Amino acid sequence: MELETIGFNVNFAPVLDIGIPYGRSYGHDAAFVSKFTEAACRGYDQAGIIYSLKHFPGMGKSEVDPHTEQYRITASKEILLQEDTIPFKNIIQNFDNQDFMVMVGHLIYTGLDTLPASVSPQVINNFLRNELGFQGIVITDDMEMGALTSMYGFREMGVAAVQAGVDVLLVCHNYEHQQQVYQGVLEAVKTNKLTTAAIDAAAVRIVENKMIKLLD
């Protein structure tokens, strides 16, 4: 409610990761984390705040800080379903309107794909959208993080993310990096590497989300 009072309508929270080592998690148990994140999400809904479930499909098993380096989480898909993705699945399947975002992290989940999650069609389109049923806005974590920049240039990472099913590309700090990501996507559309239909679908999801919040 305080965020709404001072004029904010978006918050990149809550953190749904289970037991991440640097203190941003609600806890080390999926049910416990689910309970607290559901309460947080209902509070954001009541205040009309657009929020973001992060960092899909869960970073609790990571042993590094993705701001600085890449890491491969080797848990199987079955383990991810039984543990890390439970809080995400709880919100996605139990909230009537999917008028929130899911933020996808940059780590690699070998049980799902060999690519970082934020540029993986397997993680985003197949797992998050088709299997878990999320049809709302997908946003990347900050694309300037070392986990992604260690593998991709800025002009190519945005294109790869949109191809994977991302709607919003988050580049937080450097204007030159923002321009490189933008120009990469623009050039990809001009050369038909990306379709205008994909861009239009993302725009529709974003506008629909805003309208739902305005009407709540």
Residue ranges with predicted function:
Residues 28, 32-198, 208:
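Second-shell residues forming the walls of enzyme active-site clefts
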Residues 192, 213-214:
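Short glycine-centered helix-capping/turn motifs at secondary-structure transition points
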